Design a protein with these regions (language model features):
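Mid-to-C-terminal alpha-helical segments outside catalytic/metal-binding sites
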Residues: 1-5, 12-65, 70, 114, ...
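Short beta-strand segments
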Residues: 4, 72-75, 199-201, 224, ...
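Conserved, mostly hydrophobic/aromatic
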Residues: 6, 63, 84, 115, ...
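Active-site environment of divalent metal-dependent phosphoester hydrolases
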Residues: 10-12, 78-80, 104-107, 161-165, ...
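A general structural detector for well-ordered alpha-helical segments in enzyme core domains, enriched
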Residues: 58-62, 83-87, 111-115, 139-143, ...
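Short, surface-exposed connector motifs at secondary-structure boundaries
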Residues: 65-70, 92-95, 191-198
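Active-site gating/metal-coordination segments in enzymes
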Residues: 69-70, 76-168, 172-177
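Catalytic pocket-lining loop regions of alpha/beta-barrel enzymes
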Residues: 122-123, 136-257
């Protein structure tokens, strides 16, 4: 059984947000958003998502084609909770909804409550480097309190290297403060809220050592394996095999979550990432039971099917 703990839902609203940023850079009228979004599809050579329900159905067909049982869908811009909420409502047994939240906006708490209570989303995604809000900030603590009050809700924290490929391709500025994405700061939150599961994606995205230290000290911190993990190039000689072996030794198979970081069509679900990681796990001599946990069981434990 395969469950994917990290897929992005690039909805029409996601592309609309990019279009508005492009138009602002050009000092162009905001009324041109639809035309600008169409231009983005052509420039990237990506498919038009058409509508949230259409995109949700396409993802189901794609998961079925690859034998994937369930998947996380991440609303990839703040304010796009409704798109993922629509996908989850349409396919509740297949999708688990996450949403990106900017702690600096005045209605962050209300947005979080609505996303969880009304739209039935189950993961709050924090990007401290992107939104320039430290994890030690009281605004973040209040957001985690929302999760703590709602059993079954997790907090996902992007740490380490943050490079948004679509922004780079479109020439959009990415003023990220990478100093704020330290997994050790996640440990402080995890210790304060032991009932809340935390997920650090991409093995810490270049901060593997810190991610392992944080997870070793906090039983409620999980690591996801998603993406090609190209951050390994920052450490001479480091291989993805070594990353898996070290994470398995320190964190164990019960707190690793397989993910691909799939996002757009026509590329669809990234089977190559699954194939690579499956081979690494087999080569490491991981038992069938532990491999089943990593590739699906841990997901179902964190997100029991409703």
């Amino acid at each position: 059984m395969i469950n994917d703990a990290h897929c992005h839902f690039f909805s029409p609203q996601f592309f609309g947000a990019l279009a508005r940023q492009q138009l602002a850079m050009r000092a162009a009228p905001s009324a041109m958003v639809a035309a600008s979004a169409s231009e983005i599809y052509r420039e990237l050579q990506w498919d038009d998502p058409v509508a949230a329900d259409t995109l949700a159905d396409r993802w189901i067909a794609e998961l079925d084609r690859h034998g994937v049982n369930r998947s996380v869908l991440i609303a990839s811009v703040p304010g796009d909770e409704s798109s993922v909420g629509e996908a989850v409502a349409r396919h509740p047994s297949r999708f688990v909804g996450f949403f990106m939240l900017d702690p600096s906006v005045t209605d962050a708490i209300e947005r979080a409550r609505r996303a969880i209570d009304e739209l039935h989303l189950r993961g709050i995604c924090l990007f401290p480097a992107m939104h320039h809000v430290a994890l030690s900030d009281q605004r973040v603590r209040r957001i985690v309190e929302v999760a703590a009050e709602r059993p079954g809700v997790i907090v996902f924290v992007h740490c380490g290297v943050l490079s948004v490929g679509v922004r780079r391709k479109l020439g959009l500025p990415s003023h990220f403060d990478l100093r704020l994405g330290n997994p050790i700061e996640v440990a402080n939150l995890a210790l304060a809220f032991p009932q809340v599961p935390f997920i650090i994606p991409h093995f810490g995205a270049g901060l593997l050592r810190e991610a392992l230290i944080a997870a070793d000290g906090c039983a409620n911190i999980h690591l996801d394996t998603s993406s090609s993990n190209s951050w390994t190039r920052y450490t001479p000689g480091l291989t993805l095999d070594a990353v898996f072996n070290t994470a398995l030794a320190v964190v164990g198979p019960s707190r690793l979550l397989f993910g691909t970081d799939s996002s757009f069509f026509p590329r669809g679900w990234q089977k190559g990432i699954y194939d690579t990681q499956k081979q690494i796990v087999e080569d490491a001599g991981v038992s069938a039971a532990d491999a089943a946990r990593l590739f699906g069981g841990n997901f179902d434990r964190l997100f029991p099917a409703s």
